[in-house]
């Protein structure tokens, strides 16, 4: 298992490096001048002398490979530069906004797990009957409706007409319900449908038939033989959804005025705050690859065949 963990971890390094190169080049070779944006956000006149000194200060007068090496070296030491807008270290700003984003993403993840698992099991138990049709309809809505559109519908229904929940802001538990549901709905619909399909597929396999012939009742067979094997695809999906939840907060946080990293990143994009954009994009890459690593390790722990397969190809 240790060899498998090391192998998976070493594969992350070239992935993150390749992503960092793409991020850097997209921002450096894109339209606009970082020096001009820095002066604009600092309320300084963009005279030729100021532009030249700003380019020197930001290192923009150096070759691209030198700029990238300097940025990567500082990023490895958690130095992502100074925000053009706030004139504060980017990492400090990120850490200030991160708790609100983690709170929202955590609430959405709990909602996904508490709803998708029971819905998937319920649909699989009542295949081609009313509960199954209801869950499949919910799944259809979830994959068809963008989260920002669902957010507007929830605000209109529960904030404008019924006035049960606040439309925006950050405070008590009432403020987190609508944004958490908006982020979680698509993922819980996908997971419920995936668990249903996995359970039905496993239920038709030979070892489940033999378990029933040995005298196990339906609940014992489901718990011991079906759910364990059917949970592997869902674990993979949940791991992917964790990164999507954090990335999906960008739009939702702006709709609900939630003071998180996503709202901060959108503001940086509009202001062309290059250090913040670079930091946020690289952070999202790291979140996705770490989530993939955790999912791979969980799958390997639950299914020894994965470890044996990796060992055979080592």
Swiss-Prot record:
One Pfam short name: BPD_transp_1_N
Q: Which family does it belong to?
A: Belongs to the binding-protein-dependent transport system permease family. OppBC subfamily.
Sorted keywords for this record are: Cell inner membrane, Cell membrane, Ion transport, Membrane, Nickel, Nickel transport, Transmembrane, Transmembrane helix, Transport
Q: How does it assemble?
A: Probably forms a heterodimeric pore with NikC.
Q: Which gene encodes it?
A: nikB
Give the protein's biological function.
Involved in a nickel transport system, probably translocates nickel through the bacterial inner membrane.
Positions in the Cytoplasmic compartment: 1-8, 125-136, 191-231, 296-314
Report the domain of life of the source organism: Bacteria
Q: Does the keyword Metal-binding apply?
A: no
UniProt membrane topology term: Multi-pass membrane protein
Q: What is the lineage of its organism?
A: Bacteria, Pseudomonadati, Pseudomonadota, Gammaproteobacteria, Enterobacterales
The answer to keyword Transport applying to this record is yes
GO molecular function terms noted in the UniProt entry: dipeptide transmembrane transporter activity; nickel cation binding; nickel cation transmembrane transporter activity
Q: What is this protein called?
A: Nickel transport system permease protein NikB
**Membrane spanning stretches:** 9-29, 104-124, 137-157, 170-190, 232-252, 275-295
GO annotation, biological process = nickel cation import across plasma membrane
Q: Ranges in the Periplasmic compartment?
A: 30-103, 158-169, 253-274
Q: Where is the ABC transmembrane type-1 domain?
A: 98-295
